[in-house]
C-alpha cells in the first residue's frame, strides 16, 4: 500500500497477490488420487485513486479510481490439455466530479466496467459437456444527482438517477432511481430514512470463486439485474455510546446465480450455476456499543424471505442470520477480537431421494443444517509498524456443511506478522 497526502490532491495505491491451492474434497469416494482433485487460483489486484483538494465550497473536485484484476486457474495435469484452464481479466474506471454551492452538492459519476472471461479454446469441444468459452462484457454507468442538507442539517435529500448500458451479446440500457431521504430528530437519536435504488451487477469468475471456491472453472456467466432495491428504516445514536438500526429491504433480483452440484463434468465434487429471478425481502436489526475507542460490540440479526420463479429454494442462502462481533483495545498494544456467526435455514439442490432430503415443487431439497462458527483473534502491536497475531477459527469445532458434501475443518489456527513501511 502507498498513500500520499498533498495540499492539492491525495493519492492511494494498493497491490495484492493471492495464490490459493486446495482440493475438491467433497467426494463420496475416499480413495481418489489427490492430484486429480487439486486446484490453484492465482489472483492479482491493483487499485489506485486520486482525489483533488480544491476546497469545499465553490470548487470543483474530482476523484478518479482505477481497479484492475486478473484471475487464473491451474492447467490440467495432461500436457495436451494445458490450454483448458480459466483466465479472467477485468478493470473498473470511475470518475466522480462534485461541486458544492451552499447547502447543495452537485455531483456526477461516470464509470466503465469490463470483464473478459475465457476457458479452454474458443469454438473447440473437449467433451460433449465441456467446450471452450469466451465472454467479454462491458458496462457503462452514468449517475448524476444533487445532495441537499436542509433544516440545520437535520434533513438530507439525495436525488439522482443511474443509467447502466450493458454491452453483452445484446446491448441493453437500464434506468435506476438513486434517491435517499433521511431526517434526524432528537439530536440524532431517531433518524428515519428511505432509499430507492437499483443496479446492474457484473458477474465474474472471480466473484463466484470468492463465494464458493469449489465451482467449475468453466461457467456460463450472466449479469444480475436489480430493477429496484427499496429500503425503509430507522437508526440513531444514544448517549454517544449506543447505536441502533432497523431496516427492511425489498429487492427484485433478476438473473440471480445459485450454486448447485454439477453432475455433467465432475464426480459431484464441484458446483455449477443455475439462474433464477426472485423477490427478496430482508429485515435487519442491529445494535452497537462503543466505549472510549477501547471496547466495541456489534450485534446484527437478519431475516430473509425468498420468492423464486422456478427454483424450489434459494440454494445455499440462509433464512436467518445472527452475527456478533466484539473487540477490546488495551493501551493500543494488545487487541482482542471475538466473533460469532450463525446461519439457519440453508438448503441444497440434489437429484434424488435420500436421508435428509425432501421433495418440493418436483425438486429434491437437502437440509444443510445450521452454521455456528466462533472465532478469536489475539494481536500484539510492538509499534505502529510491526505487529503479530494469532487467529483461531471455528473454536466450537463444529463440522457444519459449508456447501453440499463440504464439511468445514473442526478448528483452525493461523498466525502471522505484519510489517508496514
Residue ranges and their predicted role:
Residues 1-92, 128-132:
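Flexible loop and strand-edge segments within Gram-negative outer membrane beta-barrel domains
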Residues 92-94, 142-143, 230, 373:
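Short structured motifs
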Residues 75-92, 96-98, 103-113, 120-138, ...:
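Beta-strand-dominated lipid-handling architectures at cellular/organellar boundaries
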Residues 1, 106-120, 133-166, 292-305:
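Surface-exposed extracellular loop regions of Gram-negative outer-membrane beta-barrel proteins
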Residues 26, 119-122, 204-209:
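Short acidic, glycine/serine/threonine-rich loops at helix termini
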Residues 6, 55-61, 100-105, 150-155, ...:
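Edge/loop elements at the starts and ends of beta-strands within beta-rich repeat scaffolds
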Residues 15, 66, 90, 107-110, ...:
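Extended beta-sheet lipid-handling architectures
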Residues 152, 156-421:
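Exposed, low-structure sequence patches enriched in small/polar residues
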Amino acid at each position: 500500500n502507498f498513500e500520499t497526502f498533498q495540499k492539492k490532491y491525495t493519492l492511494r495505491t494498493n497491490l495484492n497477490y493471492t495464490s490459493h491451492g486446495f482440493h475438491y474434497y467433497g467426494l463420496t469416494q475416499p480413495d481418489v488420487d489427490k492430484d486429480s482433485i487439486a486446484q490453484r487460483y492465482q489472483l492479482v489486484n491493483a487499485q489506485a485513486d486520486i482525489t483533488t483538494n480544491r476546497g469545499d465550497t465553490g470548487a470543483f473536485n474530482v476523484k478518479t479510481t482505477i481497479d484492475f484484476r486478473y484471475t487464473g486457474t491451474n492447467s490440467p495435469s495432461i500436457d495436451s490439455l494445458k490450454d483448458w484452464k480459466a483466465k479472467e481479466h477485468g478493470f473498473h474506471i470511475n470518475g466522480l466530479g462534485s461541486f458544492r454551492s451552499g447547502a447543495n452538492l452537485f455531483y456526477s459519476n461516470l464509470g466503465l466496467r469490463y470483464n473478459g472471461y475465457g476457458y479452454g479454446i474458443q469454438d473447440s469441444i473437449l467433451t460433449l459437456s465441456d467446450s471452450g468459452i469466451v465472454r467479454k462484457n462491458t458496462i457503462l454507468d452514468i449517475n448524476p444527482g444533487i445532495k441537499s442538507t436542509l433544516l440545520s442539517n437535520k434533513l438530507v435529500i439525495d436525488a439522482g438517477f443511474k443509467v447502466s448500458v450493458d454491452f453483452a451479446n445484446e446491448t441493453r440500457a437500464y434506468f435506476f432511481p438513486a434517491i435517499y431521504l433521511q431526517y434526524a430528530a432528537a439530536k440524532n437519536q431517531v433518524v428515519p430514512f428511505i432509499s430507492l435504488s437499483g443496479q446492474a451487477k457484473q458477474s465474474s469468475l472471480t466473484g463466484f470463486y470468492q463465494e464458493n471456491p469449489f465451482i467449475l472453472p468453466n461457467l456460463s456467466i450472466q449479469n444480475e439485474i436489480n430493477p429496484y432495491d427499496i429500503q425503509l428504516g430507522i437508526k440513531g445514536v444514544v448517549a454517544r455510546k449506543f447505536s441502533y438500526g432497523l431496516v427492511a429491504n425489498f429487492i427484485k433480483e433478476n438473473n440471480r446465480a445459485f450454486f448447485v452440484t454439477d453432475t455433467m463434468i465432475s464426480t459431484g465434487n464441484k458446483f455449477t450455476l443455475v439462474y433464477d429471478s426472485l423477490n427478496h425481502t430482508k429485515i435487519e436489526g442491529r445494535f452497537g456499543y462503543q466505549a472510549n475507542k477501547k471496547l466495541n460490540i456489534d450485534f446484527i440479526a437478519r431475516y430473509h424471505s425468498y420468492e423464486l420463479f422456478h427454483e424450489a429454494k434459494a440454494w445455499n442462502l440462509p433464512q436467518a442470520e445472527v452475527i456478533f462481533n466484539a473487540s477490546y483495545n488495551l493501551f493500543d498494544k494488545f487487541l482482542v477480537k471475538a466473533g460469532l456467526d450463525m446461519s439457519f435455514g440453508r438448503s441444497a439442490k440434489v437429484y434424488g431421494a435420500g436421508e435428509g432430503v425432501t421433495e418440493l415443487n418436483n425438486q429434491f431439497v437437502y437440509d444443510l443444517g445450521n452454521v455456528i462458527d466462533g472465532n478469536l483473534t489475539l494481536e500484539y502491536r510492538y509499534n505502529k509498524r510491526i505487529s503479530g497475531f494469532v487467529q483461531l477459527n471455528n473454536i466450537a469445532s463444529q463440522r457444519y456443511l459449508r456447501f453440499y458434501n463440504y464439511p468445514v475443518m473442526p478448528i483452525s489456527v493461523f498466525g502471522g506478522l505484519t510489517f508496514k513501511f
